[in-house]
């Protein structure tokens, strides 16, 4: 899927994504450990994490975006979300490593909705938040998801260990599963 997001008077950048969600205000979002994976639910989207690396990429992106969110979303009481033509929902499953996450901040004057935006792309998921409440809901969601992932996969350090400088190990993540299959 190619989305063309108008951000300037020049040719709009192309954003490659499988699923995009645009969020404003506090919203219900949950992460649970179920069937040896982490299931995340938020408005219109369900994400299943079946590999540890996307959990790490998302957590790293949302926590590193806090300073940018504070700057670009300062003073934004409630963002603007385009009205969909109908009810739309999507589901993504991350069962392999994804490229590094991308975080972009757009001030209101460059935003297609004329509301400030913080965009976080992880794998095929693009999440756009337009105010501090939406950012906080997503930060809490991905922090909870990462905590579940760190309990599920032993190669992920805890949130506290990450803060102290520990790094995850992804070099042999498939080896135990392959060894079990060969036995």
Describe the role of every protein-language-model region:
Residues 1-183:
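Positively charged, low-complexity terminal tracts
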């Amino acid at each position: 899927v190619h989305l063309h997001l108008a951000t300037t008077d020049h040719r709009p950048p192309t954003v490659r994504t499988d699923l995009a969600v645009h969020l404003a205000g506090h919203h219900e979002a949950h992460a649970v450990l179920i069937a040896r994976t982490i299931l995340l639910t938020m408005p219109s989207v369900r994400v299943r994490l079946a590999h540890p690396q996307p959990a790490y990429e998302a957590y790293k992106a949302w926590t590193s975006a806090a300073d940018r969110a504070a700057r670009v979303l300062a003073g934004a009481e409630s963002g603007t979300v385009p009205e969909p033509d109908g009810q739309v929902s999507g589901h993504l499953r991350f069962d392999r490593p994804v490229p590094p996450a991308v975080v972009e901040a757009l001030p209101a004057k460059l935003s297609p909705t004329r509301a400030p935006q913080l965009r976080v792309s992880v794998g095929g998921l693009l999440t756009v938040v337009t105010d501090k409440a939406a950012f906080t809901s997503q930060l809490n969601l991905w922090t909870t998801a990462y905590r579940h992932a760190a309990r599920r996969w032993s190669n992920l350090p805890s949130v506290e260990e990450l803060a102290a400088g520990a790094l995850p190990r992804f070099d042999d993540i498939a080896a135990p599963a392959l060894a079990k299959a060969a036995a």
